[in-house]
């Protein structure tokens, strides 16, 4: 069981690093930072997968994983002398809820084509809200480390 979890984690991390690297290339990230974008995307997606595996819902798992991405990205930006967004934006993209958003949009199309049904409406609302909460948690999670770590005056 442990080996299958480790294999699934490794597979998840490798498959998450590929789109993180691709979006980093689309965003013209400097060549020296590309491997860090891929590594950060793999770490974020892998940590979210582990949290989901151990019973956490996808929304708070996405929040915690994006907070982790933001904190590591800020530390790496100081080390590599680049803006944190260079690392964090491309790294968080593999965690966007494509399946939930796609299912919600398919339900909208089926409602307009076939007419209203309670099952389609329920599917649409459920998947739309799930996708919205995941995107919200990703954006909040990316912004919180900057608010915490760049604060100049005391909190009290």
Swiss-Prot record:
GO cellular component terms given for this protein: plasma membrane
Pfam families assigned to the protein according to its UniProt record, in alphabetical order: ThrE_2
GO biological process: succinate transport
Transmembrane segments: 7-27, 54-74, 86-106, 128-148
Membrane topology: Multi-pass membrane protein
Cellular localization per UniProt: Cell inner membrane
Keyword Cell membrane carried by entry: yes
Keyword Cell division included in the entry's annotation: no
Keywords, ordered alphabetically: Cell inner membrane, Cell membrane, Membrane, Transmembrane, Transmembrane helix, Transport
Cited InterPro entries: ThrE_2, ThrE_Dicarb/AminoAcid_Exp, YjjB
Recorded family membership: Belongs to the ThrE exporter (TC 2.A.79) family.
Matching HAMAP family: YjjB (MF_01191)
Oligomer status and interactors: The transporter is composed of YjjB and YjjP.
Function: Involved in succinate export with YjjP. Both proteins are required for export.
Name of this protein: Probable succinate transporter subunit YjjB
Organism field: Yersinia enterocolitica serotype O:8 / biotype 1B (strain NCTC 13174 / 8081)
